[in-house]
């Protein structure tokens, strides 16, 4: 079963959870039917979730460049606390493996990137970059300025390049904040240029569950920043992570929404740019309140992460792709574990 159907159930759990008390006696409350029938978790895995353990699974994807992973955990806390923690992304996403993180102002300012250091390997790669052949994801205009404005033979070349990269990132953040998805760039690190806006739109096209279950949320994501949606928070932030073989500098747009008529929460974290590996990514998280309020506050946190990458090539491509998929699944597990700890105050 393709991930689009799976997430349809995931998002639908929010609506169903609000009516859980009206179910027939003996019926399983959300999200258990989804976890059992759609994700096909075993009784042992469902029991592990009830014990507060993180359970993850790799999902099928529509084509080779797209990878998907799902995870779930039961959290002893309130959805309101989750929303409060998620609003503070500098703390919420600050975990081992993300040594640098920052939030953009409105509008973005170059000072917002004060805590960012550019990896030495990226600076070395940029010295040799040319369109269609670069070890860093970069756009035509940015690459042109790095070639023309930085004297790579000078002693201060790395400092000049770092300052220019931050200037380019700030301009990119401003363009995205003003123009949304259509303002996302075109990378020219490979022989075939990649339009990041089209890569993200492909993820949305493969995600009709947003249209079916939360059309207002989907429309808001598509139209951002032109539309408005009640009970919604938007955060534009950046990170440098060290999870992979290379440090990755990324820019994200997080949207946190409390759907009307539910007690749950829906969040979408969109990758606006990544210096390596990722052409687009969309993470959808749903907090589904537990039906037994008498037992105390609690909710199930469901996480679906989907990304489009440049697939590995060559004789070891299958092995490398397996490692990439495993790494993404581990990332989902780590996110759920850290989120649970943040909400529970551990």
Positions of PLM-derived features:
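Bacterial N-terminal signal peptides
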Residues: 8-18
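N-terminal secretory signal peptides that target proteins for export/translocation
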Residues: 1-3
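A short alpha-helix/helix-coil micro-patch that ends at or immediately precedes a cysteine
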Residues: 85-87
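Terminal "cap-and-tail" regions of soluble proteins that handle hydrophobic small molecules
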Residues: 23-75, 79-81, 91, 96-346
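Sequence-pattern detector for short linear motifs
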Residues: 5-7, 35
């Amino acid at each position: 079963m393709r991930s689009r159907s799976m997430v349809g159930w995931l998002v639908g759990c929010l609506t169903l959870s609000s009516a859980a008390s009206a179910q027939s006696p003996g019926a399983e409350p959300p999200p258990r039917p989804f976890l059992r029938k759609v994700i096909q978790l075993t009784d042992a895995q469902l029991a592990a979730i009830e014990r507060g353990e993180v359970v993850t699974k790799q999902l099928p994807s529509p084509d080779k460049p797209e990878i998907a992973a799902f995870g779930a955990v039961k959290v002893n806390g309130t959805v309101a606390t989750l929303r409060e923690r998620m609003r503070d992304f500098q703390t919420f996403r600050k975990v081992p493996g993300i040594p640098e993180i920052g939030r953009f102002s409105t509008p973005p300012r170059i000072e917002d990137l004060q805590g960012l250091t550019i990896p030495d390997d990226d600076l070395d790669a940029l010295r040799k970059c040319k369109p269609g052949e670069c070890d860093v994801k970069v756009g035509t205009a940015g690459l042109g300025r790095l070639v023309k404005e930085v004297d790579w033979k000078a002693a201060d070349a790395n400092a000049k390049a770092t300052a220019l990269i931050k200037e380019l990132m700030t301009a990119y953040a401003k363009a995205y904040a003003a123009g949304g998805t259509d303002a996302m760039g075109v990378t020219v690190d490979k022989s075939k240029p990649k339009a990041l806006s089209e890569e993200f739109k492909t993820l949305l096209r493969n995600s009709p569950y947003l249209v079916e279950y939360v059309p207002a949320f989907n429309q808001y994501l598509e139209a951002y920043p032109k539309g408005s949606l009640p009970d919604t928070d938007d955060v534009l932030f950046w990170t440098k992570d060290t999870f992979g073989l290379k440090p990755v500098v990324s820019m994200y747009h997080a949207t946190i929404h409390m759907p009307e008529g539910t007690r749950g929460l829906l969040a979408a974290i969109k990758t606006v740019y990544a210096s390596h590996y990722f052409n687009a990514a969309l993470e959808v998280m749903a907090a589904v309140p537990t039906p037994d309020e008498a037992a105390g506050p609690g909710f199930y946190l469901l996480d679906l992460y989907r990304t489009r990458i440049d697939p590995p090539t060559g004789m070891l491509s299958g092995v490398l792709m397996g490692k990439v998929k495993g790494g993404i699944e581990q990332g989902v597990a780590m996110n759920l574990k850290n989120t649970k700890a943040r909400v529970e105050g551990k």
